[in-house]
Every structure is written in C-alpha cells, then in structure tokens.
Amino acid sequence: MRIFAACVWICSGVLCGLFSLSAFGEGTPVPVHGLWLWKSAEVLERPRGADSLRDFCKAEGINEVYVSISAQSEEQEEGRLAHLIGLLHHSNIRVEALLSSADADEPGKHRGKLLEHVRGIVQFNQKHPAERFDGIHLDVEPQQRPENKGPGNLKFLPGLVDAFLAVRAVAAASHLTVSADIQIKLLKGDLNQRRMLLTSLPRLTLMLYELSSPGNGENAEQMTEKLRTASGKFLDMAYQGLDGRNLAKMVIALRTPDYGELLPQMLKTLDDANRTNLHYAGWARHSYNDYLKAAQ
C-alpha cells in the first residue's frame, strides 16, 4: 500500500529530477552527471570556494551537485549555501541537499530526525525562493550497522523503503525531487525485494565501488572493459523480471580512489556503454573533496 500511495508523486519527480534538459532540443534528456560535496561548510569557507566548485563543474561536465547539509550548517551557513545555489543555477547546474543517516530505516527518533532535516530544507526553500534546492539526495546506510552485515541480509530493506517514502511525502509539498544512494548488495534481493526498492523513488544511485584500483596492475584498457561489463551486469541484475513505468532510473557512481586520474575516462565509459539502456540515467562522481585533496 505504501508503494502505490507514493505513485501520485512520481510525475513531477520524473520530469524534474531524472534528467537535465539538453541545449540541443527542448525536452531531450541528457544523462545526469553528478558530484558529491562533503563538508560543505569547510569547502565554502575557502577563498572563492563556491566559484572554484562552479568552475570545476563546468570543466568536468557536472550538471548536478549533492551538497552535504547538517543541522548546524543549515543554520550557520545559510547565506553561503544560498550564494552557492544561485551560482550553480546560473550555470544550469542542479543542487540537491545531501542528507545522511545510518539509522533512518528504523521508525521513531532516527527517522524523525531525518524528516526534521528534510523539513529544514523545505523551510530554506521558502526563505530563498530564488536560490532553492532542487531536490533531496539521501545517503541512508543501514547496511553499515553490524546486525545488517553479511551476504543476503536484507532484513532492513522494508524500513529503508519506508524511510524513502516518508521523505518523499515531506518533500512533495515543496516540489523537491528525491533520490538515494544504494549499494550492490540491494540488487541481489529477490524479485519482490527489488520491486519494493525500485518503485520507492524515481531515481537511485548505485555505488559501483572497488572494481579496480590504481595499484592492482591493470592498465586503462583493462579497467575500461571491466567497468563496461560490470555496469551492464548490475543494470541487468537490478531490473531482471521487472517491468512497468514506475521503476526507478539508475545512476552509476564511481569514486576517485578506484581510478585516480583515470576517473573522467571511466565516467565517460559508463555513458558510452549504457546510453541505450532505458534504465540508465547517467553517472555520479565521488567526490569533489577527493579532487581538492589531490590538488593540495
């Protein structure tokens, strides 16, 4: 019942949040090219912090940024956040509030804390209608808790889906899209478990990590082929046996430690290999903080 009740919100989320609009034709979808920004308050305190982020996004083809938000940063950094959003919007880059939790799959105080955080983003948008967040990006990771570890252990999934739907309910009134990060482990569920997950939100981001490492002796060609094969495999695994219009689109995320300087090339590989897959929505890069660290 909770899944069907959420369907009334899908249209606006799909239209506004799945893709950006191409300059080559009105309504033509182009893949998402996302970027995580952690410790946003620290980054934005730097001289030209917001401008440097904007310049990086333009140079690397990033069209949306997931900006980490804590209750403290929401209150103390409101002006800097509004400035950043305005700057990125001026360059046609979407901005989503990145909210994290390891426990929000559990009803009660943990989920309540996450929902209060979402309400804070809604209030921010009401105060800053010209510099509003475009969406909520969830990083809810119950699999990090000891009781949820182990192959095939997905007992937390119903609670995770409930958390996703609860966030959508709060975000819908402010026309905020909602997306979430997921791990490969969730794609190994049975048909009903995958249906539950893939009908909970319009878009999910698969964290496709640890396929390769700069120190494992693989050359760029080998890394590329491994990524091409794995990305197709996991897209097939996610949607096997499922059909219907209300299934989430999938963004695939890669991280800097796995590829180093080859990361931009690997991200391009994802688009080249999967652009004809109707379930593929683009890629996301983890993270801007890694870039800043490497540049020091």
Language-model-derived ranges and their functions:
Residues E96-S101, V161-L191, L247-Y259:
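Aromatic-lined carbohydrate-recognition surfaces of secreted/lumenal glycan-active proteins
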Residues Y209-T256:
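Glycoside hydrolase catalytic-domain groove-lining segments
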Residues I121-K155:
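Active-site groove signature of glycoside hydrolases
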Residues L247-Q296:
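Substrate-binding cleft of secreted/luminal carbohydrate-active enzymes
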